[in-house]
Amino acid sequence: MRWWPALPLLLLAVAVAGAGDAAPVCTRPSAAEAIVGSPEACRSPLRRPLGVTEGDDAILARAVNLLHANKEDFAAVLFYASWCPFSQECRLRFEKLACIFPTIRHLAIEESTVRLRTRYRYGIHGYPTLFLINSTVRVRYHGPRTVKSLAAFYNDVSGINPSMDPAVGDDNIEPKRDCEQEKCLFWSARTPENILQPDTYLTLAASFVILRLLYLFYPKITAFVKRTWSRRTLFTCLEQGKHKFNRVYPSKQGNLHDGARHATAWASKSLASVSIGEPSTS
């Protein structure tokens, strides 16, 4: 009967183990797992849709890696700009789509948080730009940015049916019809300084190329500058010599001008006298 004092402790250990098996503890998902989900994540039937998740370049890369692990999952990625009115309008519709398609993870990325090489990889030349991606495909949306059209695009690419009628999604969204273009172009809205600012490696590469070109063309540039400077110096010296000569010998120059004027007057008088004397001799 020596094991009777240890019986309560044994029963407590069995109860704790049974409770652990019945109700496992859900760990907090990371930012990338919150976008596309994870096989190890707890999938409760009462779990609400996550809506739109704001991300950056690093979160996008991790989300793509998780999509390769979950081959049946889809994610919608919207690249937008806060200064673009079309992006603001599309951002509201993107939130509507997150409610219409709760099984598709929605990631919104603002243009200031994405490096330039990511823009080149996805071919982003204007805002807003929408992609549907999974482990095998990456489809860009081209068409009218209405909730109904976007929902049809989701259905065609992913095969997922909407959870509600997409026709009611545009009721409280006022379209921007005061502009002629349909997209805010990236290159026309940013200066070269702002383009080089987000990516340090691009700045260093551009600086190296510029310095390399200067090194290659430096002899030619130097020779051209020397020739131009020598010609300019020679012309300046000639002009200065001419002015000095005029200051040193002003009388001779004046006498030459006076002599030329007198010679012209004498020639005109001689011609006049000859023309007058001809009738008297006849």
UniProtKB/Swiss-Prot annotation:
Residues 1-19 form the signal peptide. The chain crosses the membrane at residues 205-225. One of its GO terms (molecular function) is isomerase activity. PROSITE patterns: THIOREDOXIN_2 (PS51352). Keywords: Glycoprotein, Isomerase, Membrane, Signal, Transmembrane, Transmembrane helix. It holds the Pfam family Thioredoxin. The keyword Cell wall biogenesis/degradation does not apply. Glycans are attached at N134. InterPro entries: APRL4/6, Thioredoxin-like_sf, Thioredoxin_domain. Residues 20-159 form the Thioredoxin domain. GO terms for cellular component: membrane. It is a single-pass membrane protein. It is found in: Membrane. This is 5'-adenylylsulfate reductase-like 2. It comes from Oryza sativa subsp. japonica (Rice).
